[in-house]
Amino acid sequence: MSRVTLSRYLIEQTRSNNTPADLRFLIEVVARACKEISHAVSKGALGGVLGSMGTENVQGEVQKKLDVISNEILLEANEWGGHLAGMASEEMDNAYQIPGKYPKGAYLLVFDPLDGSSNIDINAPVGTIFSVLRCPNEYLSQNEALNEKAFLQPGTEQVAAGYAIYGPQTMLVLTLGDGVKGFTLDREMGSFVLTHEDIKIPESTQEFAINMSNQRHWEAPVQRYVNELLAGEEGPLKKNYNMRWVAAMVADVHRILTRGGLFMYPRDSREPSKPGKLRLMYEANPMSFLVEQAGGASTDGHQRILDIQPEGLHQRVAVYLGSKEEVERATAYHKE
């Protein structure tokens, strides 16, 4: 039986589910960019890509060399194809305008070019997260210049989302709104090959992922919930839990998608003005879309993340996502 490549899968989606051809081409371009990023990451010290740039992004975070390289790869790969009206990235203050010399398309691409970049220098997993939205009609008609407002759509408006994880294997995990598929990069073929046909998250779990070093800063409902997890069989949840933490959302969520679990990055008291650490548009929304399509759930502790109306490109939110039973329990504690 022949193997199903990403290209073949997308063509079949165009035939059977009426996936627009432009969306298919866009996903293929993003996948090619991810292959290039994977190659750059794998070179490590041999490619002179380790270390920091000495600059900060809009988040106030020190930029790693590979942050900047990955951002440029995604911009250059996607700006000329005619599928996009614009792009937005964690590494850029403002929306990226498609240069006038290139045709414009009907979609918007939002991405974190290299999630978990603090892991680069220690050779731990990192990844690329992306989200695809339709561009509002008023910006397509040229009546309005593209600006940040075009991107400020709730996660329910996503038409596709996914991530690439660069670890022992490079994988692309994708949803077009009809389940979740996983593709593994065959380096001999140079193609992503379908290896995980229908990714599903178990409803219950015995694993959770959270940065325990922040415990003293958490709100009371989070303290209560995590203490119950740690209490194990003797506690109110009546079972033992294991904690895992990779310090890269893409790696922690990948584990949850493949074997279940709960990922938490709650708000804390260090910066009361910030409702969370993770960015809504290019981290929480695409990951929440994937998790829900895999049968899981995702909230900010109070409401479904995909229902949040964004107020800014770099808006932050608290995140609880993964196995439905545990997400619902953690969310219920916030409402008591």
Swiss-Prot record:
Keywords: Carbohydrate metabolism, Cytoplasm, Hydrolase, Magnesium, Metal-binding. Mg(2+) 2 binds at residues 112, 115, 283. Its cofactor is Mg(2+). It comes from Pseudomonas savastanoi pv. phaseolicola (strain 1448A / Race 6) (Pseudomonas syringae pv. phaseolicola (strain 1448A / Race 6)). GO terms for molecular function: fructose 1,6-bisphosphate 1-phosphatase activity; magnesium ion binding. Homotetramer. It is found in: Cytoplasm. It comes from the Bacteria. The keyword Iron does not apply. Mg(2+) 1 binds at residues 90, 112, 114. One of its GO terms (cellular component) is cytosol. HAMAP family: FBPase_class1. Pathway: Carbohydrate biosynthesis; gluconeogenesis. Belongs to the FBPase class 1 family. This is Fructose-1,6-bisphosphatase class 1. Substrate binds at residues 115-118, 211, 277. PANTHER family: FRUCTOSE-1,6-BISPHOSPHATASE-RELATED, SEDOHEPTULOSE-1,7-BISPHOSPHATASE, CHLOROPLASTIC. It holds the Pfam family FBPase. Binds 2 magnesium ions per subunit. The gene is fbp. Coiled coil: none annotated. SUPFAM superfamilies: Carbohydrate phosphatase. Its EC number is 3.1.3.11.
